[in-house]
């Protein structure tokens, strides 16, 4: 049978797909956003939409308001529910869309359902367990839909960049636990509550040792399998995430800068994610 492409959308705006999780659970619809440039680097879309691949009909699932933009949407693996990036409402010159100034939004597609903010944000001390201090990005569900992975950047570290003794902001990987809401203070106008308890599951270093597992940056995360994997000792790791980790390779370039490369790493998630480990949850 010859291969044949079939166009299923036609409109005067962009149609951008996330690189995973765009199909509805029943395999009839594809979800997308409407950012204006093909590369998706300009975050200016205001709609989350879905197209029915059977007849080409298009439905607007969500439209952002008050100057906010939205995009990078993925579908729940077995429910009529989506999650996507949402920029700040009422943006200002000092608080507009950016890597550390965005959040996840979950939308149940049942009639009458209201969108809910995924991740709480607390920008003032004392910090709150389960709340982030910045922005989440590219949200993907685990195979059973019980967890949501995302990448994360810290707004407070962005603001303090260059301060002696303060680590710089570096992208990391986090996980949200739906159904465990987090409430924060109203001491900062951009604080907000979230429907999920969030934790950062990677660790980055300000100065990484060459040829070590010290990480400078984490990105491009992906859930492993539908039920994790079995490790070398025969132990089932039911929840695990693979990601790209940036590491130094021990040589300098022509500008005298330490060269780095991205390696593949795996993080095995504990059964109780909301329990503090070597670092606090706040």
Label the model's feature ranges.
Residues 1-282:
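Sequence signature of WD/YWTD-type beta-propeller architectures
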């Amino acid at each position: 049978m010859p291969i044949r492409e079939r166009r299923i959308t036609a409109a005067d705006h962009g149609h951008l797909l996330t690189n995973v999780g765009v199909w509805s659970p029943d395999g009839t619809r594809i979800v997308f956003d409407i950012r204006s440039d093909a590369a998706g680097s300009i975050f200016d879309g205001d709609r989350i939409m879905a197209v029915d691949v059977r007849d080409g009909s298009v439905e607007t699932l969500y439209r952002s308001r008050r100057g906010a933009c939205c995009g990078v949407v993925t579908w729940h693996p077995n429910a009529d529910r989506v999650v996507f990036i949402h920029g700040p409402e009422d943006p200002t010159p000092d608080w507009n869309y950016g890597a550390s100034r965005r959040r996840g939004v979950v939308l149940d597609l049942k009639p009458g359902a209201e969108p809910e903010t995924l991740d709480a944000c607390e920008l003032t001390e004392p910090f709150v367990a389960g709340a982030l201090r910045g922005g989440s990005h590219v949200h993907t569900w685990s195979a059973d839909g019980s967890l949501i992975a995302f990448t994360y950047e810290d707004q407070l570290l962005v603001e303090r960049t260059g301060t002696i003794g303060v680590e710089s902001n570096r992208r990391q990987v986090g996980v949200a636990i739906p159904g465990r809401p987090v409430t924060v203070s109203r001491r900062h106008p951009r604080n907000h509550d979230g429907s999920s308890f969030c934790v950062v599951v990677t660790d980055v270093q300000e100065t990484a040792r060459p040829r070590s597992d010290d990480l400078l940056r984490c990105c491009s995360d992906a859930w492993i399998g539908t039920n994790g994997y079995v490790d070398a000792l025969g132990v089932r790791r039911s929840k695990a995430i693979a990601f790209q980790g940036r590491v130094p390779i021990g040589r300098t370039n022509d500008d005298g800068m330490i060269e780095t490369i991205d390696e593949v790493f795996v993080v095995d998630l504990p059964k109780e994610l909301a329990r503090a480990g070597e670092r606090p949850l706040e």
